Amino acid sequence: DVISMWTRIPVTRLNESESERLKKLDKTLEKRVIGQEEAIQALSKAVKRGRVGLKDPARPIGSFLFLGPTGVGKTELSKALAEALFGNEEDMIRVDMSEYMEKHSVSKMIGSPPGYVGHEDGGQLSEKVRRNPYSVILFDEIEKAHPDVFNILLQVLDDGHITDSQGRKVDFRNTVIIMTSNAGAKAIIEPKKLGFTQQEDQKADYKRMKANVMDEVKQLFRPEFLNRIDEIIVFHPLNEDNMKKIVGLMCKEVVQRAKEQLEIILVVRDSVKKHIVETGSDKKYGARPLRRAVQSQLEDKLAEALLNGEIKRGDHVEAGISKKEIKFTV
């Protein structure tokens, strides 16, 4: 166990607790990421295959391209996977691809060549993976990266390793590689429809939307890159039911924080959640405006009530709606 803590390598192979965790992987992910059943199913199947030991031993556990509009849960799913697989959200290495837009930024990834400044430090990506070989690597907004950066990714996806500037081999075989992109987001938010039939079959709708997105993706990425990815997953835009569930999760977090930090037992009524969805949701921007709405309408008002002395530490507080505003009763 001590060695496992030092090296960050789970020493025990598929033991009982991990097989139980893998069995429930899709259920665990569904608790955190709302309204993306297809994405969760595809992801958990590939991860189960990889962790059981059926994958190609020379390649990463899985490589995925997540496509979808902003705020639908692409990054959240990566965090949830890191926590479900390796037991900690910290085991996600996030690489923001907007930092790798220039040609010379390749050296930032694997380290500067000998004689250049920073040669001793190693690369930003290679060092992180070397120190944390069991992790989820998230390449955020992959379409922004320079073509030379893609060449490094091709090697990782194919051979499962890269050699850094100091000649050390960095092993990617125990990582899950996730790339996110907003390519084709317009086709997801505003799918092209023919005729007047509004109530269409959802599955047919999703298939058509996926085909439109894939057309755009094929123009944007090189075929040899797309060919090496295990699964390309298209995320759904969020509907009103999803929004309500997401607000429910966010309110749960506020309730937990109030209990832990202020010893306040806070009860948030359904009418409050409904009010936040009605006033704060925007389909184009997904779940992010909801977090802002929860902050401004619930957290800010609770903070003001605490400062004014209306609510004291250790109180039992109920949040409800009165005259289209959130009010607290003690």
Positions of the model-derived regions?
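AAA+ P-loop NTPase nucleotide-binding core of proteostasis motors
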Residues: 1-330
